[in-house]
Amino acid sequence: MTMAKQAHPLGLYLHIPFCRSKCAYCDFYSLSGREDRMDAYTAALERHLIEVAPQAAQHLVDTVYFGGGTPSYLGEKRLVKLLKAVKKHYHVDPHAEITLEANPDSAGDWKALRALRRAGFNRISLGVQSTDDVCLRALGRIHTWQQVQEAVAACRRAKFPDVSLDLIYGLPGQTMEQWEKTLSDALTLQPEHLSCYGLKLEEGTPLYRQRDSLTLPDDEAQADMYLYAVEYLRQNGY
């Protein structure tokens, strides 16, 4: 494609709704146990990318983000197919940031990650949330801290230059000491980026329905966790 006129850059977001299982706090649109729909969804998303491409004809795409759901659960072949469609029908900056959200339980195969890296993905965002297996179970997460370490090692082996970790504070029963340990554990993996979010109980989620029986850090404790993260990460170069 040739660009008649360059306007402001665009970011593309591709939603991949499939999950192995739905987490207790998540209110994003996602489907668990529907692997039978993956091929049809991939084909439909590719058609949609082609249909709307003319609207972006005068724009350079500088970011591409595959979110979900659990995009890594779609499998590398389908993901590569979608990224090829993006590159074919859009003006993607050669230096564009191309991110794939992944859960640690579906990001441990370094050969699959290498295929994604070779296709053009250059950033992995891992939904770690906690390094404490008890906290992870309370969230309905199906991975372990061991799998987090294995996933990051696989990303490094596959030559991903940018690995980001998502963490959540204010979890049911979480203490400041547990949060401090989660942060220190996370830094042992030397991620390029960390995102820290306060837990929010969204209406309609399992955690929201259980809210009266949960022991949650109060607002002051959550604020302390936030401030600790800001200072601790600043001291460590983030």
What are the roles of these predicted feature ranges?
Residues 2-9, 30-55, 59-238:
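C-terminal scaffold of the Radical SAM
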Residues 12-15:
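Short active-site neighborhood of thiol/selenol oxidoreductases, capturing the structured segment around
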Residues 17-30:
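Local cysteine-cluster metal-coordination motifs and their immediate loop/turn environment
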